């Protein structure tokens, strides 16, 4: 079983750590290091290609379908008009402000939390969690570059801020 409070506070701490590290597209090494270290701390077995970091359920079985949980770790450059420091992870009124908290750090930590909780018990499917790079620029070393290293994926859930409106999309 798992401790939901522990997973919750770990997610908050990880989000703050991610915000504190500039992670502009094609410059994600430091934040990929943060995510990889967190995975290791949480008892996961991270793998890495460039700045893409992933792990899979420890009871992975090739006979079961595989679900991918994916969110990106890169951000756009800092624009003008910030009311809080973009790298300070400021907590105010039950919210955390900082560059990348919404797009897409909250998805990264939420999907990693779901992965951690779901992999503590037997499932009829495999899980893979991927924190991908270069999404903001559709870069050649982003998630697409890491996909060939993953097991065959049958279904993917991609975290991206859509104002709570489900979206279906593909490129190509």
Name the predicted role of every residue range:
Residues 106-113, 119-172:
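Fold-level recognition of mixed alpha/beta catalytic cores in primary-metabolism enzymes, strongest
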Residues 31, 103, 170:
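Short, contiguous, pocket-lining structural segments
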Residues 64-128:
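Active-site metal-coordination/substrate-binding segment of hydrolases
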Residues 1-70, 75-78:
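N-terminal helical capping/dimerization or prosegment-like subdomains
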